Regions:
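Short coil/turn motifs at secondary-structure junctions
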Residues: 78-80, 95, 128, 157
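Terminal substrate-recognition subdomain of acyl/acetyltransferases
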Residues: 140-166
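Acetyl-CoA-dependent GNAT
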Residues: 6-83, 88, 93, 112, ...
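Conserved GNAT acetyl-CoA-binding A-motif
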Residues: 113-126
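Conserved acetyl-CoA-binding loop-helix of GNAT-fold acetyltransferases
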Residues: 92, 98-111, 136
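Short loop/turn motifs at secondary-structure junctions
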Residues: 86, 117-119, 138
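Extreme N-terminal starter segment of soluble prokaryotic enzymes
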Residues: 2-3
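Conserved active-site alpha-helix within GNAT-family acetyltransferase domains
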Residues: 103, 126-144, 148-150
Length: 166
């Protein structure tokens, strides 16, 4: 069974090394400008500040299997957006990929995030393998974000139309 280990803001320095390695090795950020941004004080300061706020808090977690860290994720739950859980990062360390590990990690994340108020999930992804993975979990395409990256959603509540009550 996959367990979740939440990372406190004070523990972020050790996490950042794994994070940038994932972003570069998996081809998420291919250019030097992006690498500079994601390793810089501005980005990291924003994440840490969001981890400390009371509303719409940012979470950074490790996935554990038999006590060993096998992956990580970061996400934010937006209470005012009907419990939207926006997944910023999600990855299984390369040595543990395959055999449904990613699926089990997402299931663990969904249980953990639900306990924190998550109702539905949204993320952006454009890598072909990642898109296949998220679609295999039931995510559906839902337009693009402000950077023109494809958005995917799962479990989004249908909007209530008040005109039905007239």
């Amino acid at each position: 069974m996959i367990e979740i280990e939440e990372i406190a803001p004070e523990e972020l320095p050790a996490f950042w090394d794994a994070h940038i390695r994932y972003l570069v090795e998996d081809g998420i950020i291919p250019d030097d400008e992006d690498i500079e941004y994601f390793t810089g004080d501005e980005y990291r300061g924003i994440i840490e500040a969001h981890m400390r706020r009371a509303e719409d808090r940012h979470y950074v977690v490790y996935f554990l299997h038999d006590g060993e860290r096998i992956g990580a994720a970061s996400y934010c739950i937006y209470e005012k957006e009907s419990g939207k859980c926006f997944i910023l990062d999600f990855w299984v360390f390369p040595a543990f990929r395959g055999s449904g590990t990613g699926r089990r990690c997402f299931e663990a994340l969904a249980r953990y995030a639900k306990a924190g108020g998550a109702v539905w999930y949204e993320l952006n992804s454009e890598k072909e393998a990642s898109v296949r993975f998220w679609k295999s979990l039931g995510f559906k395409e839902s337009g693009t974000d402000e950077y023109d990256m494809p958005l995917f959603v799962k479990g989004k509540p249908e909007a209530h139309d008040d005109t039905d009550c007239l």
